[in-house]
C-alpha cells in the first residue's frame, strides 16, 4: 500500500502515481499547524478548483485532524479528477474505516488488491472493515490471501489476523528493540499498530490502548501509518 518500503520495491511503486499528485510528507504537526495547512490549501483550491494535488493534500490534513468525512470528500474529488488512481487510493479506504463506512472500505481494499495483490496491510484493513460490517469470523473467512510480503513482521501480522498466529509471534518477529535503529523502530511501530487494531476487532479495549499507544508514542514514525497510529491514539483517549 505504499506506506513502507524495507527491502522491496513493489510497495513503493504502487503509490508513486499518487505521490506525483501531491501525497505529502506526513509529520507530527500540531492541530493549529494542520488547521493552518487546511486554510492555505483551501485558498489554493478556491484559486484552482481542478488542482488534484491540493485536494489530495487537504484530504490527508483533514484525516490527521480527525475530520474523516471531509477527508473522504477531498479524496473523492481527487479521484474524480484522476479516475485511474482509484485502485491505488488506499488512503481513502482507511478513511472509510474511521468514518464507519465499512462497506465502502471493503470495496476500496478489494479494488486495491487488483494493483497491489501481495500487501498484508491491505488484507488487514479489508479484514477490519469486514469485521465491523459483519463479524470477526466473516472477516477471517474472507481474509485476502497473500503469497509473500517480505517486510518484517508482515507474515506474522497476516497469520495473526488469519487465526493461526499470535501477538507474541508478531513481536518476536519484529526482533529486539533497538532505539537507535530506524528499522527496528519501524518494525515495532507496525507490529504494535496492527496488534492494537486486531484487539479492536475483538473488542479488547485495554489491549487496544496499550498497543496503539506504543505505536503512536514510543515507536512513533513520521510516515502515513505512524500518523494513523497517532490519530487512532487520539480517538481512543478523548
PLM regions with names:
Residues 64, 98, 132, 201, ...:
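Register position in tetratricopeptide repeats
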Residues 44, 77-78, 111-112, 215:
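Canonical positions in the second alpha-helix
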Amino acid at each position: 500500500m505504499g506506506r513502507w518500503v524495507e527491502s522491496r520495491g513493489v510497495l513503493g511503486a504502487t503509490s508513486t502515481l499518487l505521490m506525483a499528485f501531491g501525497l505529502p510528507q506526513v509529520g507530527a504537526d500540531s492541530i493549529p499547524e494542520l488547521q493552518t495547512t487546511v486554510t492555505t490549501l483551501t485558498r489554493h483550491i478556491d484559486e484552482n478548483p481542478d488542482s488534484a494535488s491540493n485536494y489530495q493534500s487537504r484530504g490527508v490534513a483533514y484525516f490527521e485532524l480527525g475530520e474523516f468525512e471531509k477527508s473522504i470528500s477531498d479524496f473523492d474529488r481527487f479521484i474524480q479528477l484522476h479516475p485511474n488512481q482509484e485502485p491505488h487510493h488506499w488512503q481513502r479506504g482507511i478513511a472509510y474505516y474511521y468514518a464507519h463506512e465499512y462497506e465502502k472500505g471493503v470495496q476500496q481494499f478489494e479494488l486495491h488488491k487488483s494493483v497491489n495483490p501481495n500487501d498484508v496491510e491491505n488484507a488487514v484493513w479489508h479484514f477490519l472493515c469486514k469485521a465491523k460490517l459483519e463479524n470477526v469470523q466473516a472477516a477471517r473467512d474472507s481474509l485476502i490471501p497473500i503469497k509473500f510480503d517480505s517486510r518484517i513482521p508482515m507474515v506474522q501480522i497476516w497469520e495473526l489476523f488469519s487465526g493461526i498466529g499470535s501477538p507474541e509471534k508478531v513481536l518476536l518477529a519484529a526482533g529486539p528493540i533497538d532505539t537507535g535503529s530506524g528499522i527496528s523502530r519501524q518494525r515495532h511501530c507496525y507490529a504494535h499498530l496492527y496488534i492494537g487494531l486486531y484487539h479492536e476487532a475483538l473488542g479488547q479495549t485495554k489491549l487496544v490502548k496499550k498497543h496503539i499507544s506504543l505505536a503512536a508514542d514510543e515507536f512513533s514514525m513520521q510516515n502515513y501509518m505512524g500518523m494513523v497510529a497517532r490519530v487512532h491514539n487520539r480517538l481512543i483517549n478523548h
